[in-house]
């Protein structure tokens, strides 16, 4: 995924899709692995639960931002996109996310961890059945080369900031969600994503002040 010379809000869409896709894949594979083998350490269980909670929070906030801000704006610019279908798919995902929340809390607190992980794995796989076709539609209709020419650079930048702030307000806690966002991207993409955050977040809060709180998630994140 290359960064264009000019701002392009569609590139933000691709990056958040990459973050969520990796989060889904990691949570799915690890839930199956730990259901079979158990958690090697208590800290691994804590980290997995934090990672799964962050995944749910980020996906929920992303779809709220699309429903409430992005799609109403883009309907005027790209009227042929299947917005009603995409919103209906979001609603399907909301119901599954509710199930994932329940299963994650069972993993966090319940004594039957293997059974809870197996149930979580089933629900995560059902997310994947909707998620992958869903983002395929979005990325076809809202490709950077289509969205880029529709808006001046300042408007791309304004929307990028608006969408990011809306997602931030609807997700959390920040000390888990921000590292989840940054470190589910490879380093070359992380650089571009981090530029949209305040320096105090990327240079002080994440690496220093929040470090102990998100450290248990480290095994599930990219270096």
Where is each model-derived feature located?
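Small-residue-biased structural context
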Residues: 1-223
């Amino acid at each position: 995924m290359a960064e264009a010379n000019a701002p392009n809000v569609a590139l933000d869409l691709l990056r958040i899709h990459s973050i969520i896709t990796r989060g889904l894949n990691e949570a799915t594979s690890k839930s199956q692995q730990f259901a079979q083998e158990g958690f090697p350490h208590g800290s691994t269980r804590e980290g997995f639960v934090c990672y799964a909670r962050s995944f749910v929070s980020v996906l929920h906030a992303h779809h709220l931002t699309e429903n409430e801000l992005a799609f109403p704006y883009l309907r005027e610019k790209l009227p042929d996109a299947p917005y009603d279908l995409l919103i209906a798919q979001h609603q399907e995902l909301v119901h599954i996310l509710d199930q994932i929340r329940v299963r994650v809390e069972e993993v966090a607190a319940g004594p039957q961890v293997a059974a809870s992980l197996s149930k979580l794995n089933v629900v995560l796989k059902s997310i994947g059945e909707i998620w992958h076709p869903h983002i395929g539609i979005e990325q076809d209709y809202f490709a950077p080369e289509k969205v880029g020419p529709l808006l001046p650079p300042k408007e791309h930048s304004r929307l990028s900031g608006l969408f990011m702030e809306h997602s931030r307000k609807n997700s959390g806690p920040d000390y888990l969600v921000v590292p989840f966002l940054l470190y589910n991207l490879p380093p070359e993409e992380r650089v571009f994503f981090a530029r949209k955050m305040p320096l105090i977040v990327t240079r002080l809060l994440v690496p220093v002040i929040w470090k102990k709180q998100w450290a248990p998630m480290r095994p599930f994140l990219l270096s």
